[in-house]
Amino acid sequence: MKDKRNSLLYFMTNLLGPPILFAELFTTKYVVDLIQNFNPNAYLHILLLVSLLMLMLYLAGINGSLRAISVTNLTAISIYELEHSILNKTSKLSTALLEDPATKTKREKAKRLSLIDLLDQWMGVTVHLVTLVVLIVVLSCYGFYILALIILGVQILQLYLMRRMSQKVEAISANQTSTVRTINYLIDLLVNRNSIPEVRMYRMSSYLFTKMREIFISNFKQMHRKVIYSESLNFSQSLIMILLNGITIAILAMTIGSSGQSAGLFVLLLQISNQLFAVIPTLTRVYSDLVKSRLRYEDYRSYLDLEEQVLSDNLESTIKNIDAMQVQIKHLFFRYATNAKDTLRNINITIHPGERVAFVGENGSGKSTLVKLILGLYPSTAGSIQWFKGENEVLAHNLRQEIRVVFQDFTKLHRPIRENIALGNMDAFHDDSRLVAAMKKAEADYFGVALDTLVGPQFGGTDLSGGQWQRLAIARAYLNNGSLTIFDEPTAALDPYAEQQAFDTFMKLGEQQTSIIVTHRLYMSKFVDKIFLFEHGEIVECGTHEELMKVDGKYKKMFNRQSSLYV
């Protein structure tokens, strides 16, 4: 989003500030000189100069108002641009990188930047520095160059001290980003709809409040010491500037008074002195803020420079055939960045075109992790995964248009039904016939509500049951004509009847396509072509249901144990 008009207005109003200021100063000098050397014939001249001075004051007011308008507009734009750039970058990062706590901390650090503040601080330092230099030059031109050098030296020392202090304070603030994330997480537990019942039933509130207080106090103590030191430094600098200001006025008064120069010159130099001691603390403060913003900009750039995952934005498959997909996995190992051990070890699987397979095993055995690798969401630590349609290999960055999936934690979009379904293929967003057809296939059309009906209670929409949300997720998958269908244990939270319905729908969804179902409910595995039993990240058994039941192995024991629960 660009706004050239407001940007131009912003730069013009900032750059016009110093010329208007100096025009006011010198016009005031000439008015005072004319009054001092009053001449009855100078009425018109005085009137013109006073009118000019009033015009300058009026222009200064107009300039300030126009600047405020441009800053307000640019602030709104900069907030959008910052959020957009961070979200756009996030959408291009790999899932593994997104789940890394270090990446989450980097993202939070990047969000602390204010683009308009950074721009305004750069402009402020530039304008105030130019103003300061010109004021010192004018002071020097009237013979007060030693005083000008003293003031300049004090300013340089102040800028150096404030730079050091700003770096230390910002370093503390940056280091506290991860603990601030923890506080926000604890707050979310206290207000989130899903966590509130358990938090209240088990009386966890006081414990969570205590943890928040401990983190807050720790952060506060770290920052408090630096703030006291910073404010002590500011107080010392302010005292020095007050004394220097008084000395400057005294020198000007004695020097000009003893030399018999005009009152206008004294007024000019007095105003310059006042401007100097107004500009110096302002410049120091703006420079201090700029140092902090530059450090935050480095954090922002650090996040934007993270390595991106290459994905194709072309929704049309690069392979023009309707063949079912073949998946070939060889000697695959995978380890999460935060884990000390491999989550998957030496996985070797070939899923043939049109084959239905089931990944079964206890929770945490590695089933869902392998699915994420098959989806191309994680890169393998070692080994390889290849995808084929016919004789052609499907490249990893083209997988999005070849696979349709219903996740265990599928997205419950608290938005209109249209948006919930169209997530499967945004090209069909305005195609009501395709959306309705997908709903019918998923048996989600019984809601009896229009496509633009808002669902989800968060914004006052219709609340749906788990089974109804499930149907919307399946309708979303129907909208995508993929050659590989994956059902990643999305029925875990459903009642038995809804679970059976969902499984039947999945079997229809994967007709004539390669299909993978991930489940720990083994009755579902009776209807697939091949079963892979996972345990501690390894495949320990493989075969059809009948083959595995003939072997007195782990699958048979698990199946019989689950079956006994229903007898």
Regions found by a protein language model. Give the residues of each.
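C-terminal portion of ABC ATPase nucleotide-binding domains
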Residues: 504, 512, 521, 526-567
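An intracellular "coupling" helix at the cytosolic face of ABC transporter transmembrane type-1 domains
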Residues: 109-119, 171-178, 188-191, 200-247, ...
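ABC transporter TMD-NBD coupling linker
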Residues: 262-338, 379-381, 430-438, 514
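Transmembrane helix-loop-helix hairpins at lipid-water interfaces of multipass membrane proteins
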Residues: 8-63, 139-169, 259-263, 390
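Juxtamembrane loop-to-helix connectors within ABC transporter transmembrane domains
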Residues: 91-135, 191-202
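Cytoplasmic coupling helices
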Residues: 69-88, 150-191, 261, 285-305
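Conserved "ABC signature" C-loop
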Residues: 410-459, 481-483, 554-557
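Helix-loop-helix
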Residues: 35-40, 138-153, 229-298, 303-304
